[in-house]
Amino acid sequence: CEGCGDCGVQSNCVAVTPVETELGRKRAIDQSACNKDFSCVKGFCPSFVTLQGAQIRKSQTAQLDLPQMPEPVLPNIDGTFNVVVTGVGGTGVVTIGAVLAQAAQIDGKGAGMIEMAGLAQKGGAVHIHCRLANRPEDINAIRVATGECDALIGGDLVVSAAAKTLGLTKVGRTGAVVNAHDIVTGEFTRETEFSIPTDRLSLALQARLQDRVQLLDSTELARITMG
């Protein structure tokens, strides 16, 4: 790879990701995002090699040595407990919201969820609003209003630090856990030297939520444990 980016230009695919090396920016294929249309091989590049009849070797996984985790202290729900889940289409954001709502119903509580995906298909911004309550009748409107988010689960740093998301949060009320992994946006398919301003996005979250935000590379954790 010479870092020209023609594979991304030809394929218009966000599975072509940047890799920063001591020899400059190179390219790699994010296997979890690849849709296998192989249009990236149309790029004028000798580093793509096609193997006929080869089988994909699954990467080795590791077992995380986690300490014994205590049971969480559940908050007292006065009215509703409002959860916002953000991320990129195609990565399970809607599934997380559905699991939360279903778990609440199984536990005898009320739950309501809406998907705010708009035109987002694979790779687009997705917002899930989920309200939990002791009784279903305690939930009037499902959409979380400005400053009413109690918990933010961020699957993507860009979406989580956007003004639309931060407007739902409130200092002293909202707690957040956000994936700090660099997930490339569609801009990278058009601008080969585009870089996500990770530091600025992280600072925006920390300035808003102060010590109530936790940033971690959950994408790398998933790769290590799931392959």
Regions found by a protein language model. Name each.
Residues 2-28, 33-58:
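Iron-sulfur cluster-binding cysteine motifs and their immediate structural context
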Residues 49-85, 91-227:
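Active-site cofactor/cluster-binding pocket
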